[in-house]
């Protein structure tokens, strides 16, 4: 079904980039997963816990092994008494989760004799999610799957949540490295401005190919080798720390132009706040000459640069806050008004 509502929200907690299945994952550690779950249980009433993409790394492992790596954490959050809803917004590394749900929707229509094709964009919402099967019997938390973004009304202003991989389309220095180069040429001939559907169609072949690779383990190594080539040129063209994605490891201020380009396509050109992940660089900022606050959720993977924090999440209520998990609990890193 289509997702076009903007409900009033209480506290929202957003976390992303756990990458269950990848060798850099951290929350597969039972003690760390339990400690984070305990901290979340003490954050007061939570209207929604948003899993903002790359929960699973389906470019490295197939679905069941990846979920198995995250089972302890997923069971933990599903059992939180203070969380009302869990919303799963897939990213690029778990894009296949959305595609599976979309195909099931199409197949259900065909079984009813309905041969119409559901609208792919701007967003689709499904009750339940593949991970809801790990909820303990009797759990009151509800699960939903939404792709590629959700909006919520917080403190009277719109807040947009999305993983962030669509921002890669707007990177001026290295967008050609994937299918985006061809897409730009096609779009330029057909119309002056790309749509969200165009960007998704450009992203689809790449994500699809990478999600198939884990079924043939030898292909995973080839895919990672392809990325290493991209990274080499990215370091020459833009930054010394670029990894895994066009925007991976970029700072929030380096993403402002991409965010400006994407927001109108989401139908929310000037929200109060834009929350995303994808880059593995936690932070909070404000786009110059606007009232748009930007927050990045960071990641739960090992960082090559010890100076880059991980174990971070974002909380949105009356304002937006960035927290980090420490040995003593939740440490407030930054906050900004919406």
Model-identified regions with their sequence ranges:
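Acidic, His/Gly-rich catalytic cores of divalent-metal-dependent hydrolytic chemistry
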Residues: 210-234, 286-338
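Low-complexity, flexible helical/coil segments
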Residues: 48-54, 84-89, 122-128, 188, ...
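Core catalytic region of metal-dependent phosphoesterases/phosphodiesterases
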Residues: 2-15, 20-153
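Alpha-helix-centered segments that form part of catalytic cores
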Residues: 128-147, 236-269
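N-terminal short leaders/motifs
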Residues: 38, 83-84, 90-92, 228-229, ...
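Active-site-proximal loop/helix segment associated with metal-binding centers of metalloenzymes
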Residues: 159-258
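A signal for specific C-terminal beta-sheet/loop modules enriched in small/flexible residues
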Residues: 4-12, 32-36, 73, 177-184, ...
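Conserved beta-sheet core of the metallophosphoesterase superfamily
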Residues: 107-119, 147, 155-160, 165-188, ...
């Amino acid at each position: 079904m289509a997702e076009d509502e903007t409900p009033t929200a209480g506290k929202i907690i957003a976390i992303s980039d756990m990458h269950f299945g990848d060798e850099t994952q951290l929350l597969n550690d039972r003690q760390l997963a339990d400690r984070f779950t305990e901290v979340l249980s003490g954050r007061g009433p939570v209207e929604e816990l948003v899993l903002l993409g790359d929960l699973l790394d389906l470019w490295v492992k197939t679905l069941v092994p990846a979920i198995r790596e995250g089972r302890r954490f997923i069971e933990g959050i599903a059992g939180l008494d203070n969380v009302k809803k869990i919303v799963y917004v897939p990213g690029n590394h778990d894009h296949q989760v959305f595609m599976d749900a979309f195909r099931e929707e199409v197949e259900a229509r065909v079984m009813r004799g309905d041969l119409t094709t559901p609208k792919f964009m701007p967003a689709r919402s499904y009750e339940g999610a593949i991970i809801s099967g790990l909820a303990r019997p009797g759990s009151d938390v509800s699960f939903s799957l939404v792709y590629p973004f959700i909006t919520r009304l917080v403190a009277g202003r719109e807040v947009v949540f999305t993983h962030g991989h669509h921002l890669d389309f707007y990177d001026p220095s290295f967008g050609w490295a994937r299918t985006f180069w061809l897409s730009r040429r096609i779009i330029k001939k057909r119309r002056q401005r790309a749509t969200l559907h165009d960007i998704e169609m450009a992203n689809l072949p790449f994500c699809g190919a990478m999600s198939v690779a884990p079924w043939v383990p030898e292909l995973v190594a080839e895919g990672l080798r392809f990325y290493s080539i991209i990274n080499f040129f990215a370091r020459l063209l833009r930054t010394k720390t670029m990894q895994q994605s066009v925007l991976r490891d970029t700072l929030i201020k380096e993403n402002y132009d991409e965010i400006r380009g994407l927001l109108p396509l989401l139908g929310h050109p000037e929200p109060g706040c834009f929350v995303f992940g994808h880059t593995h660089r936690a932070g909070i900022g404000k786009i110059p000459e606007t009232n748009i606050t930007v927050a990045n959720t960071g990641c739960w993977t090992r960082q090559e640069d010890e100076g880059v924090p991980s174990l971070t999440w974002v909380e949105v209520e009356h304002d937006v806050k960035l927290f980090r998990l420490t040995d003593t609990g939740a440490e407030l890193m930054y906050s900004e008004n919406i």
